[in-house]
């Protein structure tokens, strides 16, 4: 293999690595968007369930409390964590908790929100 062939192969490899980096970054951004949307929809869904539950309680007061089916509501702390994450702070367990993310997404934080 002569120098020119070696140089061309290195250039092709560099181009492939750059393309992989770009693709990985795009996939990460898409994943973050989807997880954030999922968390927002879960919170909205739980709020709607809570609202429906209150409405059903006022309409169906004759039901016995033992027979009434309660829907599990999200903890207010999870809502607070989601709010802190949207404001740009780490909510993942460990030494990063409470530190500013500087506009970067954190997969560990998103994992906490998705649990």
From Swiss-Prot:
Entry's localization field: Cytoplasm, Nucleoid
Essential cofactor(s): Zn(2+)
Any single GO CC term annotated in Swiss-Prot or TrEMBL for this entry: nucleoid
Cofactor note: Binds 1 zinc ion per subunit.
Chief place of localization: cytoplasm
Annotated InterPro entries: YabA
Keywords attached to this entry: Cytoplasm, DNA replication, DNA replication inhibitor, Metal-binding, Zinc
Residues given in the record as Zn(2+) binding sites: 90, 92, 106, 109
One GO BP: DNA replication
Top-level lineage group: Bacteria
A Pfam family reported for this protein in Swiss-Prot or TrEMBL: YabA
Subunit structure: Homotetramer. Interacts with both DnaA and DnaN, acting as a bridge between these two proteins.
NCBIfam families assigned to the protein according to its UniProt record, in alphabetical order: PRK13169.1-2 (NF009641)
Family statement drawn from the similarity comment of this UniProt entry: Belongs to the YabA family.
Physiological role: Involved in control of chromosome replication initiation. Inhibits the cooperative binding of DnaA to the oriC region, thus negatively regulating initiation of chromosome replication. Inhibits the ability of DnaA-ATP to form a helix on DNA; does not disassemble preformed DnaA-DNA helices. Decreases the residence time of DnaA on the chromosome at its binding sites (oriC, replication forks and promoter-binding sites). Tethers DnaA to the replication machinery via the DNA polymerase beta sliding clamp subunit (dnaN).
Protein name: Replication initiation control protein YabA
Gene: yabA
């Amino acid at each position: 293999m002569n120098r020119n062939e070696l140089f061309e192969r290195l250039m092709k490899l560099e181009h492939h690595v750059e393309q992989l980096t770009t693709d990985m970054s795009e996939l990460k951004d898409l994943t973050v968007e989807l997880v954030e949307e999922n968390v927002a929809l879960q919170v909205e869904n739980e709020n709607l369930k809570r609202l429906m539950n209150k409405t059903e309680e006022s309409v169906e007061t004759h039901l016995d409390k033992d027979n009434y089916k309660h829907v599990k509501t999200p903890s207010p702390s999870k809502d607070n964590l989601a709010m802190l994450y949207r404001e740009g702070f780490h909510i993942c367990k460990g030494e990063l908790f409470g530190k500013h993310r500087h506009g970067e997404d954190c997969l560990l934080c998103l994992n906490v929100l998705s649990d």
